[in-house]
Amino acid sequence: MLVNATEMLIKARDGHYGVPQFNINNLEWTKSVLTACEEMKSPVILGVSEGAGKYMTGFKTVAAMVSAMVDSMGITVPVALHLDHGTYEGCKACIEAGFSSIMFDGSHYSIEENVEKTKELVALAHAKGLSIEAEVGSIGGVEDGVVGAGEIADPEECAKITALGIDFLAAGIGNIHGVYPANWKGLDFEALDRIHKATNNIPLVLHGGTGIPDEMIAKAISLGVSKININTECQLVFAEATRKYIEEGKDQQGKGFDPRKLLAPGAQAIVDKCKEKIELFGCAGKG
């Protein structure tokens, strides 16, 4: 059974560890993430971008697939199915489709419009038992067509959005989606501390977790970050393992072309990467 993300993130905040959000793109991805989290006894948030939802033929398909897999795989750890960087329309669709959590990315609106839309979605989500994440200060880079400039969030705006009753907050602190450039200045911990103090101890979210040094992740967790999003890193190891399989000619040996065999090394690479992140975030055994 899917759960919303509120309880697992409050426990993470109070226990000073991070819950991973691993984005999923298909059945293999979902199976790999669930396998890793069950083996490590870690709670998990399965992130689905609107682009990934469309790729998997729609939010209803995703919700049905994930719910069935959690059941048929005998998963015992808490699993939330979460819309990542949702539009206003996407959030409403996921509430109806059977997701257990949503993120409304209103960071590109004026603060007034962001407040108005967030307020409405908080009421809709909570009425159906979903948790809701909101964003202030856009996250840099590109996430499935959503382009962010990498702003530092204003603590006052963060406080305004938090007061609307959201369950966790994504605040830009210099983090970006994708691979970090060589001249990246790092996370702004002073900004994170100000945001944490201004938002009444709400669980904070760190987007763009790929490529952030381990010591920065640990410091972010100590300053109130309870959820860390990983996507690009899993994509990179999946691509690398699949490429190696083909370059070694294994797809031409026997029935090596069978997609179940062809995709197996990539799927295992995702399992291994997820386990590595679970150890880093300190959430092994917390499920």
Region spans (language model):
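A short N-terminal beta->alpha junction/helix N-cap motif
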Residues: 17-25, 50-54, 261, 265
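Alpha/beta enzyme core
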Residues: 3-15, 27-52, 57-76, 85-202, ...
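Active-site proximal loops enriched in glycine and acidic residues that flank catalytic Cys/His/Asp
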Residues: 173, 208-210, 232
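Extended, intrinsically disordered, low-complexity segments
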Residues: 246-287
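Short catalytic-loop micro-motif centered on adjacent basic/acidic residues
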Residues: 19-23, 81-82, 103, 204-207, ...
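Generic N-terminal amphipathic, Lys/Arg-enriched alpha-helix
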Residues: 4-20, 253-260
